[in-house]
Amino acid sequence: MSILINKDTRVITQGITGKTGQFHTRMCVAYANGKNCFVAGVNPKKAGEDFEGIPIYASVKDAKAQTGASVSVIYVPPPGAAAAIWEAVEADLDLAICITEGIPIRDMLEVRNKMKAKEAAGGKKTLLLGPNCPGTITPEEIKIGIMPGHIHKKGRVGVVSRSGTLTYEAVAQLSELGIGQSSAVGIGGDPINGLKHIDVMRLFNDDPDTDAVIMIGEIGGPDEAEAARWCKANMKKPVVGFIAGVTAPPGKRMGHAGALISGGADTAEAKLAVMEECGFIVTRNPSEMGRLLKKAIGI
């Protein structure tokens, strides 16, 4: 098993005809079961055409009706990306994964409010991963997004992170130690995003094929502390935690739009302290994540 996606997932690529969409669709199709998983693309101006055998439809709704796809991945440029997310939500997909970085905050606020209103009115809930995220992978089954597939190995450790490159770092360390991953999830570094650490930790906790988790956060926002407190009360599996930005000065944005210390609780040290209090195995050195996880699961 896995969380969010598996070899039976069927995927629509929104933005399949752009350079980025084409490149990463190619990479995803070439990985594991990708040839069967990526079944449609969307571009209203190119409906009826195809990209390397993948049919292109005018809308997500059409693509879903024709292929039965339940997940979309979005490579649409920032000005149109929020509208692309909403199109996936309106089509009642299970999951929309938005890779795009630099979506205006106002656009994301609008989409989030519309998603909440739809849910409150009894409409289907579509999970959103991202924006500004690397996507998610279930090793040796399917990858949706921009992560390098070859570093992953199938196994029983979950990885969740706000940072794409730190996800890859944790995964590479685990694989080098001979420890495989059940799923790796990049939730993205924007201040307004979909799934949070707490949501992914819940999924890993409930997944019978995940034995332990590496949770990676960064400065800014309350997400990691909220997830740690939830884990203290509910998590049945060992968690290794790392927070990037120990040396970050207050008020300076560090890479991601959401990586900004605006109060004492937003600092790396404050978050690490909460994680330690909540029973996490914490490291201040990212090169130790894999080794600590190995120790935690007793191999």
Stretches with model-predicted labels:
Residues 1-299:
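Catalytic-core regions of core metabolic enzymes
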